[in-house]
UniProtKB/Swiss-Prot annotation:
Keywords: Cell inner membrane, Cell membrane, Membrane, Protein transport, Translocation, Transmembrane, Transmembrane helix, Transport
Major localization class: membrane
HAMAP family the UniProt entry points to: SecF_B
Protein name: Protein translocase subunit SecF
GO biological process: intracellular protein transmembrane transport; protein targeting; protein transport by the Sec complex
Species lineage: Bacteria, Pseudomonadati, Pseudomonadota, Alphaproteobacteria, Rickettsiales
Length: 311
């Protein structure tokens, strides 16, 4: 019995992606500008990792239902609330941001009242402390520099594996993806915390992987079809990898959707941001990082790429 691979597009599809190059560039520039303007006006909803907050240590008479307790406290609309065990199962740490001193005692009372009304436990409040942010200004700046150097390292890697202009294409796509992800985070008021930084790094990794698959096919087709121009080769390469691209994005989105629906509040911001970033990364790999190579169509492609390839 012959087994056929799963495909979402016909084998001989010949969609003219390059015909939409100017439209996709304009669309991406507009979205990026909107994101930057929105961020400059409305900023981010910084989580307690960045702004500090209050820690309440409490002991219960029995092990609590943590998922239900997280859901109840998250519904109080007092900002991000982090609930976790420390020591034994009956010892809890409740951490939340302090937006202003006036609301400090009020929010503590709201939490205590909510716990008392919704759970049949005996609560022994042991300590209430103010804690500073886990992520200081210097660490934020160091993280930004690390991301910048990661961009440069990726560009160098792609340049060594392919050619320098391939690295330039991926760099533009990554900057596009990060700007859109940050804009989306600002618009949707997702908590900006350590998990969302991890989400941005995940988006970068996914976008690079998606672009490299198309670049590999472009390099292969440059060696196979010497008489085709670069626009035809890019179109052909995108179409040949389209089934793989669609299959990958669907399976990844489905896995991420499970995290959004069942992962709970603790990873909600991470899951939602990665979901958006996967879509943005797929779009940029097809409509930005590959078409941008046509900027170099008037220069002679390095013969080593066409005849031998690198890596």
């Amino acid at each position: 019995m012959q087994i056929y691979p799963l495909r979402f597009v016909p084998n001989k599809i010949d969609f003219d992606f390059m015909n939409f190059k100017k439209v996709s560039y304009s669309f991406s520039i507009i979205l990026s500008l909107i994101s930057l303007i929105w961020i400059s006006i409305y900023k981010f909803n910084f989580g307690i990792d960045f702004v500090g907050g209050i820690v309440i240590e409490v002991r219960l008479d029995q092990a609590p239902d943590l998922p239900k307790m997280r859901a109840v406290l998250s519904a109080l609309e007092i900002g991000e609330v982090v609930l976790q065990n420390f020591g034994s199962e009956r010892d809890l740490s409740i951490r939340f941001g302090s937006s202003s001193e006036e609301n400090l005692m009020k929010n503590i009372d709201i939490i205590k009242t909510s716990l008392r009304n919704n759970f049949p436990y005996n609560f022994e409040y042991r300590k209430v402390d103010f804690v500073g942010p886990q992520v200081g200004r210097q660490l934020i700046e160091a993280g930004a520099m690390a991301m910048l150097f990661s961009f440069l390292a990726i560009m160098v890697y792609i340049g060594v594996r392919f050619e320098w202009y391939f690295g330039f294409g991926i760099l533009i796509a990554l900057v596009h993806d990060v700007i859109l992800a940050l804009g989306f985070m600002s618009m949707t008021k997702l908590d900006f915390n350590l998990s969302t930084i991890a989400a941005v790094l995940t988006i970068i990794g996914y976008s690079v992987n998606d672009s490299v698959v198309i670049y590999d096919r472009i390099r292969e087709n440059l060696r196979k079809y010497h008489k085709k121009n670069i626009t035809e080769i890019i179109n052909l390469s995108i179409n040949e990898t389209l089934s793989r691209t669609i299959l990958t994005v669907i399976t990844t989105l489905l896995a991420n959707l499970a995290l959004i629906l069942f992962g709970g509040k603790a990873i909600h911001s991470f899951s939602v941001l990665v979901f958006f970033g996967i879509i943005a990364g797929t779009y940029s790999s097809i409509f930005i990082s590959a078409p941008i190579l046509t900027m170099f169509a008037n220069r002679k492609f390095n013969k080593k790429v066409i005849t031998q390839g690198k890596g």
